[in-house]
Regions:
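Conserved residues in the N-terminal Rossmann fold of short-chain dehydrogenase/reductase
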Residues: 129-130, 172, 332
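Conserved glycine-rich Rossmann-like NAD(P)H-binding loop of the short-chain dehydrogenase/reductase
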Residues: 97-112
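Conserved Rossmann-fold NAD(P)-dependent oxidoreductase catalytic core, especially the SDR/UDP-sugar
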Residues: 12, 16-20, 153, 157-217, ...
């Protein structure tokens, strides 16, 4: 059976100025009368949007597994007001945990999401904490008060060019922050710790990706050390996926703003490609991967077809009713610091093992000795707290030897 790539197939119509609309599934049509005759209402016909172009068929997850995993548990989500964090909160709420603890440093987004959550889930108990994952005492106070059974660690810096400018901040949030939360999960006997990672951790070319790879190494090596002596210890699992549509700072809302302003639309390179997922899709796979975990895995997801960003820009311009290059110009600005033309979900040396969900794979990665690597990581953290950028990046490169900088001032460290 032919596999359909929506962005390519629908582009055929868009390129010929044929307006494409969407309708609900047949089962969602509106009953017209008491005989249950159904009709399609005008209001149910909607213009297509870019998410429709990129979206793949609905992903099925084993909701029974996830329910057994989360029901009546105390669940903590760090970075709970972020794009991924708040969607994880919403999806977790559907499985009726005893308490959902939202840990967040940004007070305004936290306030806003709490208002929405109380309307959407009036029966669910939500607790909230304003705290910085970089502050070990704050993190411990949160664990001491709530003793979470499950932790989803979504708090992170993720902006590639900015982290090239401020590598010490990437280390302190993405590495020290992850270490603080992981260490407290062990101390307070959390059952499962789920770290949200990124495809940029694979063969990293930038500070952000390298910092996430170091965090992956820390939590995995910690688990391997603990599990040797105690098979019932906290289970650590990492989930790794690509770009998320509509997340803060992602390309789609950025292009929308540029198109609304009349252009130009800026693309870094005509050949740059990326994998995309919708936020709900990514979050649902995180939940199922967490439920599947036996401890120590790095899960990667089937991200579907990669999308050429230039094609995405052109289609978004056409969807807005304009002609690319005529009504709205596309300008190629050059790759940004730390950016590469394509992302990888796996290192070429990493093999995969299938799981019960065909969309979720286990990456077989190099294992690190905890005692050795934790010493190196602590030295890296000390450098970030007290030192300067270049020595900090140099230490990351020693921990992650495949980290080779691109379009970056740190390329000189690779010579």
């Amino acid at each position: 059976m032919k596999t359909i790539n929506p962005i390519k197939d629908l582009s055929i119509f868009i390129n010929h100025n044929i307006r494409v609309m969407t309708t609900p599934y047949f089962n969602d049509y509106t009953p017209e009368n008491e005989n249950n005759n159904i009709a399609l209402r005008i209001g149910q016909i909607e213009s297509i949007n870019v998410e429709d172009l990129l979206e793949r068929p609905t992903i099925d997850i084993n909701t029974e597994n996830v329910r057994n995993f989360l029901y009546n548990q105390v669940v903590m989500i760090t970075g709970a007001a972020g794009s991924i964090g708040c969607e994880i909160v919403r999806q977790v709420a559907n499985y009726h945990p005893r308490v959902i603890v939202l840990l967040e440093i940004a007070e305004s987004p936290l306030h806003d999401i709490l208002i929405d959550l109380k309307k959407e889930f009036p029966e669910q108990h939500f607790a909230h904490i304003i705290a910085d994952v970089r502050d070990a005492q704050m993190v411990e106070e949160a664990f001491e008060e709530y003793e979470p059974d499950v932790v989803f660690h979504a708090a992170a810096y993720k902006h590639v060019p900015l982290m090239e400018e401020f590598p010490r901040q990437a280390v302190l949030t993405n590495i020290l922050g992850s270490k603080n939360v992981a260490d407290m999960a062990v101390k307070y006997r959390t059952k499962r710790f789920v770290m949200i990672s990124t495809d940029k951790a694979v063969n990293p070319t930038n500070v952000m990706g390298a910092s996430k790879r170091v965090a992956e190494i820390y939590v995995q090596s910690l688990y391997l050390k603990l599990a040797k002596d105690n098979p019932t210890c906290t289970k650590f699992v990492t989930t790794r996926f690509g770009n998320v549509l509509g997340s803060n700072g992602s390309v789609v809302p950025y292009f929308k703003k540029q198109i609304a302003a009349g252009g130009p639309v800026t693309v870094t390179h005509p050949d740059i490609i990326r994998f995309f997922m919708t936020i709900p899709e990514a979050s649902s796979l995180v939940l199922e991967a967490a439920a599947l975990s036996n401890g120590g895995e790095i899960f990667c997801f089937d991200m579907g077809h990669p999308v050429k960003i230039a094609d995405l820009a052109k289609n978004m311009i056409r969807l807005a009713g304009y002609e690319p290059g005529k009504d709205i110009e596309i300008i190629y600005t050059g790759l940004r610091p730390g950016e590469k033309l394509y992302e990888e979900l796996l290192n070429q040396k990493e093999l995969t093992i299938p799981t019960k969900n065909e969309k979720i794979l286990v990456a077989k990665v190099r294992e690190y000795d905890y005692d050795s690597v934790s010493t190196q990581i602590q030295a890296l953290i000390d450098e970030a707290q007290n030192g300067k950028a270049f020595p900090c990046v140099q230490r990351m490169k020693k921990i992650v030897p495949e980290y080779k900088s691109k379009n970056s001032i740190y390329e000189q460290l690779d010579k």
